[in-house]
Amino acid sequence: MKLNKYIDHTILKPETTQEQVEKILAEAKEYDFASVCVNPTWVALAAESLKDSDVKVCTVIGFPLGANTPAVKAFETKDAISNGADEIDVVINIGALKTGNYDLVLEDIKAVVAASGDKLVKVIIEACLLTDDEKVKGCQLSQEAGADYVKTSTGFSTGGATVADVALMRKTVGPDMGVKASGGARSYEDAIAFIEAGASRIGASSGVAIMNGAQADGDY
């Protein structure tokens, strides 16, 4: 198992500086992580920095609340891809999901999938705000809409990934869809626990610490 290729090396805090982004990019190249996940404003910088590596550029859409309209999320997606994004992590319409307005949830994800072309789409369900039934429904709708992954968390709500949520999401989507655990992996042991529960990708700001077997503090 190449643990480095499970990791989306992540820096999403709003106060992030260019110097901090450049540090993350350098680390991603050094450790050959799966991707770097940055806010849209840093996508062009990341794409330029990573162009001669196989580290992908991941960004976030409708982040962190998920409460924009489908048209806005689709525009954000197209803009991010035009700037060099390879992977799109979009926040599901959490309020619509909890209301039971599944048509809107589906339309919302489909708009991003359509705008993404052949790029990878991961749907953040924000599991910490959902009941287990809502988590299952969010995963099912993401799958129906043609997304490539479901993802546990933004890292900016009341909680991050749990092993139980990852296991439930994997059970729901089966073997052919990706599951990303984010906002909960701070150590090598955390990462392995998520992978054993069914995670195929891990979003963490602690990628270097995970690879070095150390404990990291902080989230995104």
Curated annotation (Swiss-Prot):
For this UniProt record, the keywords arranged alphabetically read as follows:
Cytoplasm, Lyase, Schiff base
Q: Which gene encodes it?
A: deoC
The UniProt entry's sequence similarity note says: Belongs to the DeoC/FbaB aldolase family. DeoC type 1 subfamily.
Q: What class of enzyme is it?
A: lyase
Subcellular compartments: Cytoplasm
Q: In which pathway does it act?
A: Carbohydrate degradation; 2-deoxy-D-ribose 1-phosphate degradation; D-glyceraldehyde 3-phosphate and acetaldehyde from 2-deoxy-alpha-D-ribose 1-phosphate: step 2/2
Q: Which GO terms describe its biological process?
A: 2-deoxyribose 1-phosphate catabolic process; carbohydrate catabolic process; deoxyribonucleotide catabolic process
- Its name, as the record gives it, is Deoxyribose-phosphate aldolase
Q: Name one Pfam family in it.
A: DeoC
Which reaction is recorded as catalysed by this protein?
A: 2-deoxy-D-ribose 5-phosphate = D-glyceraldehyde 3-phosphate + acetaldehyde
Q: Name one GO molecular function term.
A: deoxyribose-phosphate aldolase activity
**PANTHER family xrefs:** DEOXYRIBOSE-PHOSPHATE ALDOLASE
Return the Gene3D superfamilies for the record: Aldolase class I
Recorded E.C. number(s)? 4.1.2.4
Mind telling me which SUPFAM superfamilies this protein's record contains? Aldolase
Catalytic residues identified in the record: D89, K151, K180
Chief location bin: cytoplasm
* Biological role: Catalyzes a reversible aldol reaction between acetaldehyde and D-glyceraldehyde 3-phosphate to generate 2-deoxy-D-ribose 5-phosphate.
A GO cellular component annotation in the UniProt record: cytoplasm
Q: Which InterPro entries match?
A: Aldolase_TIM, DeoC, DeoC/FbaB/LacD_aldolase, DeoC_typeI
The organism's taxonomic lineage, starting at the top:
Bacteria, Bacillati, Bacillota, Bacilli, Lactobacillales
